[in-house]
């Protein structure tokens, strides 16, 4: 429907260019739902990938961690969580150079019996299928614990993303209002650490696609361009394809 209604939109034109391999990557600040649907139809999912996911890098005390899913899918099953862990592990190995990234499941408690039936089943599935699964993680530890990958459904993930974004802006504004001039440089450094203007990759597609916020600044687009170029040069799509081909041939 989106493709038929707006065939000449900049988003669709860019996706078609990516499909035809006339460009190496695509970046947009357009509607997220339209992007996911259109890219899945035009670019297609990598064989073996169950669902395309939004996987932003969230800054914290130890650098950053990958959050997935951050808004692409609300309804997930245990196999989807395993699939997400696999996708994010490949992405983490490329972006952070960590070949054995830890995987946590966002939940209301650390016990394996906590959460909804889907989360309980996802815990069991990840425990059996993913060697680097480290169990549940409560939200209060997101900012001060060393984690590499944090899994949740898209509804919860989008709330986490927007809450941390809003909270960071609020705290920085409070510091600006209350601090004296001599602390201005420290505030600028904090802003660089808690940078929520960064872009988000759409993992699972047969092409490199980045999503920026609708109110993104030039810094966000600059980051997206640099990240897209990096992922292309490091052959992210080939590496994901090769991983899932290996699974299918076993």
PLM regions and their residue ranges:
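Phosphate/nucleotide-donor binding subsite
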Residues: 1-23
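Short, charged beta->alpha transition segments
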Residues: 13-17, 51-58, 88-94
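Active-site-adjacent loop and "lid" segments of alpha/beta metabolic enzymes
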Residues: 1-8, 37, 45, 142-149
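Glycine-rich phosphate/nucleotide-binding loop
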Residues: 40-53, 59-67, 145-150, 154-250
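Glycine-rich phosphate/diphosphate-binding loop of Rossmann-like nucleotide-binding domains
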Residues: 74-139, 148
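Glycine/small-residue-rich loop that forms an oxyanion/phosphate-binding "nest" at active or ligand-binding sites
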Residues: 12, 18-19, 34-50
